[in-house]
Design a protein with these regions (language model features):
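N-terminal cationic and glycine-rich segments that engage phosphates or anionic surfaces
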Residues: 1-101, 106-434
């Protein structure tokens, strides 16, 4: 990886792209420090200090801590991510959108425009919801009369505009920089919050000094587990099952085509962190509603008890969380991968899987293989997402989003490295041909 960056830096065009990407990421981090007016600075820091484990903590992680500080980029690129996911799902259900995805560059341009509009709407809704949470926490300077209305409009518009600016900056990286812009901005936000590792370390040492010597052993053990987890995620992120394909020879005129061997790659983790995001969003909804309506245990004991069952540290939460990850993994793979289309494409190109007849037997074989790989991927995601929760309960340390952040950081790093290698390979071949 380091050798790739070193070689890329020697190429002027790639050096400009790398510097542009770095500039956008620096501007993004600066925007995460610009406060929104009429909100008490640091008023919500205590709410996130213990690791809420709900959707707010997830949003805070994605924005690099900007949400807890109520800054301009509090929502980060989350509206754009949600809009992209929604459009992917709708493209399967709505024929018009499905046709747009198949219409080449013009169709893709229309899809991007619709996605941007959806993202702006989601950003507005999230901004309004976040405003009411801030209001319930007593962090607003004005809440009544004209001043209250004016401050509400300013706050909501600031959060919405900030999220749209983040999306625009991500798109600029896509066109003028290196790698996926939105992914790199999330990466930058996560890395910026790595200072929390120091806080977790001091908490463990403090407990060890307070008469719990077990935590002296726990610290090096956590370091070893973290290294093992990184290796585990890297291996399974790159792991894939390759289904061999043999293409028949065809004679056209005086030339012979085909007769090559290839393969169909099926990645173990085809869905990335999407199932974890979906599952965490659904599981955290009760807790988010609890924060929104600000329930009191004395006045509403039944409702308070119901929402307490879905506490992040409860066994029920962990069970539901893992089951939803498995379910969403199968669901998302089913949307992305169509064995029938693959079988038809192979048949059209005179390709066959050795030992499998073309047509329905081929699609059945791919479906069966895909089902097995998806199960392995689902178990992998469940371990990565669930293990930090269990470990956090044992150690009493807030590491709830460790699995998600690890998947994102490793995935973005590998994707950016591949993007750099792709640029370098294309430049080499271009120079060779010229």
């Amino acid at each position: 990886m380091l050798e790739t960056f070193r070689n890329a830096w020697k190429i002027e065009d790639l050096r400009k792209r790398l510097l542009f990407t770095l500039l956008i990421l620096v501007l993004f981090r600066l925007g995460c420090a610009i406060p929104v007016p009429y909100i008490s600075a640091g008023a919500l820091t205590s709410m996130f200090a213990g690791g809420t484990g709900d959707m707010l903590e997830y949003l805070n992680m994605m924005s690099g801590g900007a949400l807890s500080e109520c800054t301009l980029f509090a929502l980060g690129v989350q509206p754009a991510i949600n809009a992209s996911i929604i459009m992917q799902l709708l493209a399967v259900a709505i024929p018009y959108l499905e046709n747009l995805t198949k219409e080449g560059e013009e169709g893709q341009r229309k899809m991007r425009r619709i996605t941007n509009y959806v993202g702006a709407g989601i950003g507005l809704l999230l901004s309004i919801g976040y405003y009411f949470i801030i209001r319930n926490m007593g962090a607003l300077s004005y809440t009544e009369g004209f001043a209250g209305i004016f401050s509400a409009v300013v706050i909501v518009l600031a959060f919405t505009a900030g999220s749209q600016l983040c999306t625009w900056m991500g798109n600029q990286i896509d066109t003028k920089g290196i790698g996926n812009g939105i992914s790199l901005m999330i990466f930058a936000g996560i890395v910026a919050r790595w200072s929390s590792i120091y806080t977790a370390t001091t908490n463990i040492l403090a407990r060890a000094q307070n008469g719990e010597p077990f935590f002296y052993i726990m610290l090096p053990l956590l370091v070893v587990l973290a290294l093992v987890a990184v290796v585990f995620v890297v291996i399974l992120t790159n792991a894939e099952r390759r289904i061999p394909v043999q293409y028949a020879k065809r004679v056209m005129g005086r030339k012979m085509y085909g007769g090559q061997s290839s393969y169909i790659p099926i990645k173990v983790n085809m869905t990335g962190v999407m199932p974890i995001i979906f599952a965490s969003t659904l599981c955290s909804l009760p807790g988010l509603i609890f924060r929104f309506i600000n329930l009191d245990a004395a006045s509403h004991p039944a409702l308070y008890a119901f929402f307490s069952v879905f506490n992040y540290n409860s066994v029920l939460y962990l069970i539901v969380y893992v089951l939803l990850i498995v379910a969403f993994n199968y669901f998302y793979v089913a949307i992305q991968y169509n064995p029938v289309d693959i079988a038809n494409q192979l048949r059209k190109n005179n390709g066959t899987i050795p030992g499998i007849r073309p047509g329905k037997p081929t699609s059945d074989f791919i479906t069966k293989t895909l089902s097995k790989i998806t199960l392995i991927g689902a178990i992998f995601l469940a371990i990565v997402a669930g293990f930090p929760i269990i470990l956090g309960n044992i150690t009493g340390t807030s590491i709830q989003l460790g699995g998600t952040t690890l998947l994102i950081v490793v995935g973005v790093a590998l994707e950016t490295g591949r993007s750099l290698e792709g640029y370098m390979t294309a430049r080499y071949h271009k120079g060779f041909l010229e």
